[in-house]
Structure formats: structure tokens, C-alpha cells
A protein has these predicted regions:
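Compact, glycine-rich, soluble single-domain proteins
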Residues: 7-57, 65-66, 88
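C-terminal structural segments of small proteins and small subunits
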Residues: 56-89
Length: 89
């Protein structure tokens, strides 16, 4: 199992489009992927769950990934978040 804290750096935080990109990417992996913020833990493959986290810019989320492709999943999701979900700001 891998765990990592990641800061949300894009201007609008985990809004609908960013949440959709995250859940779409998470769905490509067989591993179980969980995101936690403020003691709320949600399945990263659920767009409604991810949006309910209401993670704004500067928020820290905790990623927990467990499964055969956990390393690849962690690298891909961390890169997506660091790249501001491809939004450029």
C-alpha cells in the first residue's frame, strides 16, 4: 500500500472538470484508490465522492493506493495533480 499527501495547486481546486479527469485516470488502474481530506474518505473512482471533498487550491489531500499497479497509479495521479489537471493555472 502506498500513501502520499498532495497539495491541490490548480486555481479552481477539485471542481467538476478536474474531478472528472482524476476519476477517469483512477479508473484506468486495478488498484483500490482512496482520497481523504478533513477526515472524509472517498473512492477516487467516484466522481461524486471526489467532488464532495470540496478541495480548494492549497488544500492537502491524502492519497492511499493498494493493488498490483499501485506504483503506476500513484505516479500518474500525482503527476496529474502537479500538472494542475492540464488547466495551466
Amino acid at each position: 500500500m502506498l500513501q502520499q499527501d498532495i497539495e491541490i495547486v490548480n486555481k479552481l481546486g477539485l471542481h467538476a472538470r478536474a474531478s472528472a479527469k482524476l476519476t477517469q485516470m483512477a479508473g484506468q488502474f486495478a488498484s483500490e484508490i482512496w482520497i481523504e481530506r478533513n477526515e472524509r474518505r472517498v473512492n477516487a473512482k467516484s466522481i461524486m465522492g471526489v467532488m464532495m471533498l470540496a478541495a480548494n487550491k492549497g488544500s492537502t489531500i491524502h492519497l492511499e493506493i493498494d493493488g498490483a499497479d499501485e506504483n503506476e497509479a500513484m505516479q500518474a495521479l500525482a503527476a496529474l495533480i502537479a500538472d494542475r489537471f492540464g488547466e495551466g493555472e
